[in-house]
Amino acid sequence: MLETLRERLLSVQQDFTSGLKTLSDKSREAKAKNKPRTVPCLPKYSAGLELLSRYEDTWAALHRRAKECASAGERVDSEVVMLSAHWEKKQASLRDLQQQLQQLPGLIADLESLTASLTHLEASFEEVENHLLNLEDLCGQCELERHKHMQSQQLENYKKNKRKELETFKAELDAEHSQKVLEMEQTQQLKLKERQKFFEEAFQQDMEQYLSTGYLQIAERREPMGSMSSMEVNVDMLEQMDLMDISDQEALDVFLNSGGEENTLLSPISGPEASPGQDAVTLQVPTPSQAPATPPSSSSPGTDPASRDPSEGGESPVVQSDEEGVEVDTALATLHSDDSDS
């Protein structure tokens, strides 16, 4: 478009210059025709000079105006080029807008479908959220059940361990108790044997002294021994007894022959603890008239030798204890009888 405009401007300029040339030529021909041929005239140089100067001025003005028109045409051409580019941009924008406007119904349909899809997705999201909440509740319940199961297992293991410890402790206590009971029984048996041996030795010494001297009288009393098998007992019962005269040798022989029975009689007396509630223990040696029929026996507590009948013999020997009484321990007597049986 600009090229055609330039070509037109150039053609107009050429036409203008050619028209000026033709006009100058025609004016020259007209002047030549107006001259009379017959009458010769002299050339007027001043008029030609003026005409030439006028033509030069006109040509210079035309040339200047042509340059101005060319510069204006160039400016118009640049503006037209810019306008054409701007128009092309606007045309492209209009085409794009037209295409977008043509696509607008499809876009609206897509938006409607997207809206429906979003609604469906919202419902799906709500359902998934509800399922997730249910799943979270189930996970919490499972975790709680697992924790309860672990706690119950720990409780069962704790109970088992405590039961095992209790059984072990019971077994240890039973073993310790049985061992202590066995040791106590052994020590008690040893103490009882020692006491029995001690009483037998004391009895033997007293009997030897009695056989050698004929009487047994103890001037001083011994203090009670310390505790044996958790009991305080009076020792040397025979040393605390006063033996009176014997009437004849036959009664002594009968008394010596019945030593086994007296040992059985004295064995429960050696074990028990002396009790202040009893009055006395009296041992009577039989007379020759009573020797074949009556063995020596222990009188009941509270028997007074001064109250005996003098018809039985005023000289009958009597063994009387200085203690207030003797309390018989049935348990020790039983153990002593078991030892004597064995």
UniProtKB/Swiss-Prot annotation:
Pfam families, alphabetized: Dysbindin (PF04440)
| Region named Disordered | 263-342
Q: Which UniProt keywords apply?
A: Cell membrane, Cell projection, Coiled coil, Cytoplasm, Cytoplasmic vesicle, Endoplasmic reticulum, Endosome, Membrane, Nucleus, Phosphoprotein, Synapse, Ubl conjugation
Entry annotated with the keyword Transport: no
Its topology with respect to the membrane?
A: Peripheral membrane protein
Q: What is any one of the record's Gene Ontology cellular component terms?
A: dendritic spine
What is the first-listed, main subcellular location in coarse terms?
A: cytoplasm
Annotated positions of the Phosphoserine modification: S11, S316, S321, S340
Q: Which residues form a coiled coil?
A: 83-180
What is the protein name given in its UniProt record?
A: Dysbindin
The question of whether Ubl conjugation is a record keyword is answered with yes
User: Organism's domain of life?
Assistant: Eukaryota
Quaternary state and partners of this protein?
Interacts (via its coiled coil domain) with KXD1. Interacts with CMYA5, PI4K2 and RNF151. Component of the biogenesis of lysosome-related organelles complex 1 (BLOC-1) composed of at least BLOC1S1, BLOC1S2, BLOC1S3, BLOC1S4, BLOC1S5, BLOC1S6, DTNBP1/BLOC1S7 and SNAPIN/BLOC1S8. Interacts directly in the complex with BLOC1S5, BLOC1S6 and SNAPIN/BLOC1S8. The BLOC-1 complex associates with the AP-3 protein complex and membrane protein cargos. This BLOC-1 complex also associates with the BLOC-2 complex in endosomes. Binds to DTNA and DTNB but may not be a physiological binding partner.
Modification after translation (UniProt): Ubiquitinated by TRIM32. Ubiquitination leads to DTNBP1 degradation.
Cell compartment(s), UniProt = Cytoplasm; Cytoplasmic vesicle membrane; Cytoplasmic vesicle, Secretory vesicle, Synaptic vesicle membrane; Endosome membrane
Mind listing the GO biological process terms from this record? actin cytoskeleton organization; anterograde axonal transport; anterograde synaptic vesicle transport; neuron projection development; neuron projection morphogenesis; platelet dense granule organization; positive regulation of gene expression; positive regulation of neurotransmitter secretion
- For the motif Nuclear export signal, what are the positions? 243-256
Q: Name the family the entry cites.
A: Belongs to the dysbindin family.
Ranges of biased composition (kind: Low complexity): 286-305
Task: Describe the function of this protein.
Answer: Component of the BLOC-1 complex, a complex that is required for normal biogenesis of lysosome-related organelles (LRO), such as platelet dense granules and melanosomes. In concert with the AP-3 complex, the BLOC-1 complex is required to target membrane protein cargos into vesicles assembled at cell bodies for delivery into neurites and nerve terminals. The BLOC-1 complex, in association with SNARE proteins, is also proposed to be involved in neurite extension. Associates with the BLOC-2 complex to facilitate the transport of TYRP1 independent of AP-3 function.
